[in-house]
């Protein structure tokens, strides 16, 4: 990849507990020969997801290529955090060949995707795809998130969050922006639950 080639970015979205970190860990361990970088969007004093991913670092995705945005929901802190983080990854040597972004469970993908049109970065990176993870059992039950209390605690802890969007609307935004939707934990949902979840998403 030359410095003139746009760097592809895959956005991975889904509620807390839907399996985003597990998917990214799998992709890190199976990079297909590409140098990866990862942006983990979380907030609070302890970066649990970031620590988990850094513990899985491999030569194709060393720990210094794993950056955390811990100041709040990525869709609400684009100018202050997201753009500088992208620029920092672009400046790494060797330069990453693909960036994975794990959004917080409350992030609205649409504002984040619009950020890729910012003048500072639009000529250098491109959205390769958006993957939405959905807990099959939670979707089938109409909860959307596997642990509503944990999601609400996450919402309360984020001072930068500038939207009070209901979980159903956040879910709709995640699904409508997705190029690929993965139903996770199918063993907990069972065949009937998976069928209901598919009907709801469709």
Model-derived features with residue positions:
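Nucleotide-state-sensitive switch-loop elements of NTP-binding domains
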Residues: 2-13, 18, 22-169
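G-domain G4 guanine-recognition motif of GTPases
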Residues: 102-104, 133-138, 178-196
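C-terminal-of-GTPase-core extension/linker across diverse P-loop GTPases
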Residues: 157-167, 173, 178, 187-202
